[in-house]
């Protein structure tokens, strides 16, 4: 056949037409990634195949230094590109979505951004967000602080959605910011007609020039292209694998909303206003912490592994109000007696941990565990990593974990 992996072809068979990029496939079928983003496998026997465009690895876009620029009289906004779907297209070699594009490419694709702000771009990473690590959070927070010190009026962080809530939580603890720091992503790549990248990026840029001096996440609020929600970085969670409105505030309202057509921002909750606090960076983390999910019948030796392996902190995602089976309690006590903080959270996600209602919970507290209040388990993990990076004193770490640092705890839960 006169086509290769990565070429764009048209297949006509049995009255149907399939057009897309050739993906790796077995010998029996040709697999193409269509413009919709979905894959189609077609038996080539009896099919008419037309080569539309040659495209090989040599033509695949490469990450490059960023020189994105807007208009000089507008507020200065820096886009820090870390990769993810908002900065991705279909890879010409495999047909899969890869993170190869920079802030320059985002601005080229969405020129409306330059009407809102003087855009500068900087590539930090070009990775899919499942490859994020604690060391990257440390570098990212440092890069944000550097851009603010250099005069940026707002920061946008282009990030993959899968682990965005972890990164947003990390920066919420590591930074006090006088300007907006806005995480934004996309559930669907720019190649797809249903992509949410343009609207999300435009709304994020408007928030970046607003008075909301918080680390926040801006994503679709509904499945329609009507408005985006502005979430605190510590109260947001990805609640669906693929829907455009996957991000929701948990145990809290969003900070507010931004209308896509009017760009008007409506705030719901109090927030730190622009220039109300000085820039402060505390980006030391202790990566040797873990989030442990309890399930019925789970062997308590799971905790022994972490204790014996030298882990510095543990977050347990318990049932209901924050429970584990009674045979886990001795190992919780062993951990705390060895100076390892243990934080109890709930796999219910919504609601508040309270280990004073039932006997099991009371025994967990007697073993030295700390109630995680209404913190999301993932946020509690990141906060514990940060707390351990700030102090070696167990009592001080406990006090940090019980304190509301970056909106991660609410006085009362809504639902």
Swiss-Prot record:
Task: List GO BP terms, alphabetically.
Answer: amino acid metabolic process; regulation of translational fidelity; translation
Query: What positions does the domain Asparaginase/glutaminase occupy?
Result: 75-404
Gene Ontology MF annotations: asparaginase activity; ATP binding; glutaminyl-tRNA synthase (glutamine-hydrolyzing) activity
Active-site residue numbers: 85, 161-162, 238
- Using the chain's own numbering, where are the disulfide bonds? none
PROSITE patterns in alphabetical order: ASN_GLN_ASE_1, ASN_GLN_ASE_2, ASN_GLN_ASE_3
Cited SMART domains: Asparaginase
Any idea what this protein is called?
Glutamyl-tRNA(Gln) amidotransferase subunit D
> Could you tell me which species this protein originates from?
Methanococcoides burtonii (strain DSM 6242 / NBRC 107633 / OCM 468 / ACE-M)
The organism that produces this protein has a lineage beginning with: Archaea, Methanobacteriati, Methanobacteriota, Stenosarchaea group, Methanomicrobia
């Amino acid at each position: 056949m006169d086509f290769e992996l990565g070429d764009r072809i048209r297949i006509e068979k049995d009255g149907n037409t399939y057009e897309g990029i050739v993906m790796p496939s077995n010998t029996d079928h040709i697999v193409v990634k269509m413009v919709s983003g979905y894959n189609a496998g077609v038996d080539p026997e009896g099919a008419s195949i037309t080569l539309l465009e040659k495209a090989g690895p040599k033509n695949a876009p490469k990450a490059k230094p960023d020189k994105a620029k807007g208009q000089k009289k507008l507020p200065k906004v820096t886009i820090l590109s870390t990769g993810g779907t908002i900065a991705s297209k279909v890879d010409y070699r495999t047909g899969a979505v890869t993170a190869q594009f920079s802030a320059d490419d985002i601005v080229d694709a969405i020129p409306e951004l330059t009407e809102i702000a003087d855009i500068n771009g900087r590539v930090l990473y070009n990775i899919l967000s499942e490859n994020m690590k604690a060391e990257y959070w440390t570098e990212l927070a440092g890069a944000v602080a550097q851009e603010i010190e250099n005069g940026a009026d707002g920061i946008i962080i282009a990030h993959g959605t899968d682990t965005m809530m972890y990164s947003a939580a990390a920066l919420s603890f590591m930074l006090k910011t006088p300007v907006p720091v806005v995480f934004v992503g996309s559930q669907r790549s720019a190649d797809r007609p249903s992509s949410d990248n343009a609207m999300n990026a435009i709304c994020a840029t408007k928030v970046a020039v607003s008075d909301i001096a918080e680390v926040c996440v801006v994503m679709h609020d509904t499945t329609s292209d009507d408005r985006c929600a502005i979430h605190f970085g510590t109260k947001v969670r990805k609640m669906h694998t693929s829907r455009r409105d996957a991000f929701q505030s948990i145990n809290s309202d969003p900070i507010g909303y931004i209308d896509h057509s009017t760009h008007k921002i409506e705030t719901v909750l109090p927030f730190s206003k622009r220039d109300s606090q000085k820039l402060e960076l505390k980006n030391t983390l202790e990566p040797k912490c873990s989030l442990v999910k309890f399930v019925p019948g789970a062997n308590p030796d799971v905790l022994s592994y972490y204790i014996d392996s030298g882990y510095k902190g543990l977050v347990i995602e318990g049932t209901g109000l924050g429970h584990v089976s009674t045979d886990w309690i001795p190992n919780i006590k062993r951990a705390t007696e060895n100076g390892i903080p243990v934080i109890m959270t709930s796999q219910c996600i919504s609601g508040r941990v309270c280990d004073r209602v039932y006997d099991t919970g009371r025994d967990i507290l007697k073993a030295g565990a700390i109630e995680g209040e209404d913190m999301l388990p993932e946020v509690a993990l990141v906060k514990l990593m940060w707390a351990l990076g700030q102090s070696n004193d167990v009592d001080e770490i406990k006090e940090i974990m019980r304190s509301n640092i970056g909106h991660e705890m609410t006085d009362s839960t809504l639902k």
